Amino acid sequence: VTQSPDHGGVVTTAEPELSNADGAEEAAQPSAAAEPDLQGADGATHPPKRSEFAWLERRWVAAGVFAAAGIVLFVAYLAQARTLPVHLDAPSGSAWQTLQAWDMLHGNVLLRGWSLADVSVYTTELPEYMLVELIRGLNGDVVHVAAALSYTLIVVLGALLAKGRATGREGLIRLLVAAGIMLAPSLHSGTDVLLSGPDHTGTQVPLLVIWLVLDRARARWWVPVVVAVLLAWAQVGDAIVLVECVLPLVVVCAVRMYRRPGPLAQQWYELSLAGAALVSVGVAKLVLAVIKQAGGFTLRSPVIGFSTAASMSAQFWVKVQRVLELFGASFFGLTLGHSAISIAIHLIGFALVVWAVAVGVRRFFGESDLIVQVLVVAFVLLLAAYMFGTKPDANEMIGLLPIGAVLAGRLLPGRLSRARLAPTMGVVLACYGVMLLVNAVHPAASDQSQPSAKWFEAHHLTYGLGQVADSSKVTVDSGARVQVRPTRFYNHQLVTTSWQTDASWYDANQHDANFVVWKVPSTCANACQPVTDLRNEFGPPATTYQVGNFIVLVWHKNLLANVPMLYWCGNVWPWNASGPPSAKACS
């Protein structure tokens, strides 16, 4: 008795298990003998009845359906993304990536002078941002368009991966289960994580492409080469690829080789894939080093480690809530009402993912499907890294959503059919569609409290300083006609730091910053530095404006001469670091 790698079921066979990759692949292919002609009651021989979904297998039909679905999803996700202002209150700071892509479009391909965060997104989202800006220019909607495009690709590629090589009814059910779980991100927490800044979200696109290559390609010499190149490409943009794809692939290949002993010549495919994954790590590091040596951007080393016992205990339920929020299923603090219906429906999707992961773990060592094994290990490793790590941000485990959805699509259709739950799942899918529509027609965000780019232009203010959470947004919204650069206070002095910034921004020989836009302390629970510190440092302003919740102070001098660059190395979020700065620049 062996597991069918295509359908997840059990078939009885007298054939011995094939030990090499080519033979295993041939065993996975449907043969003509598997579909004998059927003898009717009249004694005549008839060909087997074609599936009612066979028309979907025609390539041009499938391509057309996926293209149409992708367009519809993109429009819906774009509308939902616009319900959120430009994402600036987290290390991802999407406005910064927008400016980086704009700089690259204008010749600074290596981002010379830029100090990036611990995730560069240089090879993941930045090319996407460049494409959007090439078409639409620099404006606040770039973030929304890019986010909608990324998530559309995640849903479509995830559905394709879940389908695998299955055909007919089973292939359709696989596809719909995976797509349904990801279809309708919750309006608030889901939009904030999945349809905002590029913080590990876009990384899922190249990972899904890699898994599709592993799933669809025959075991040939070029597959490990392609996988190595794609893995290195993705790791240059985001080191989380090491946890989500590199380690799982190495672990699974090692397990498969151990479980199927024999000459290395017969295990060349698994050995090559594991080697390709390991080589990609070195290649990615080499590429980053070459970029830095050539005068390009510098990348902050990721803060990687285990949380302390006290922090782990304090953050456990917060992290559980974040995981549920990722799936739109968080019921913490829920008041019964219309939102409870949405959460209950999303809980069904979350339950399917938990069920699929449990099935995958239980049958892991007997599983013949390489991609299922890789995804099971990826899910477990990513969840463990998040729960035992130091960061409680939901962005750190975004991959759980597409990985879990694909596992549900590949492992549960047969079980759902046997339990006669297919009609129920159809109703749930329809509910997901309704929620997507409701989210898409929600009014777009509008922030009237902050001075607009037009206001600054009308007052002839084109270069100034501001708080980190609001500054770059003005620059993006104005198409860089008005440029406001991020700063923070340290010991009552206005300073800046090397995190998602370009050193040239603060060069007094290149720019003349003559104003500061600052949030009124009473509007931020008195967490903002008082405006009196600005007056004490720069002297009385020539003009002061009150615009909404902000104060704009204007001087007749260049403020950059008194804004030093400080460094907080080893800090997850240096813009809010409370300790003393580092003695030298971070490496």
Map each language-model feature to its residues.
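Membrane-interface micro-motifs in multi-pass membrane enzymes
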Residues: Y122, R165-D215, G237, K391-G404, ...
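Membrane-interface helix-loop-helix junctions at transmembrane boundaries of multi-pass membrane enzymes
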Residues: A166-L172, M257-S272, S339-A378, F388-K391
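Short hydrophobic/aromatic helix or loop-helix immediately within or flanking a transmembrane segment
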Residues: W96-D103, S115-D141, V318-T335
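Hydrophobic/aromatic-rich transmembrane helices and adjacent perimembrane loops
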Residues: D199-P206, V243, A340-A351, D369-S417
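Short periplasmic/luminal acceptor-recognition loop of GT-C membrane glycosyltransferases, typified by
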Residues: V119, A458-S498
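Membrane-interface alpha helices of multi-pass inner-membrane proteins
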Residues: W222-A239, C245-P248
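Signature aromatic-anchored transmembrane alpha helix within multi-pass, membrane-resident enzymes
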Residues: V65-I71, V279, L412-H442
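Transmembrane-helix motifs of polytopic, lipid-linked glycan transferases
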Residues: V145-G171, V209, V354-V357
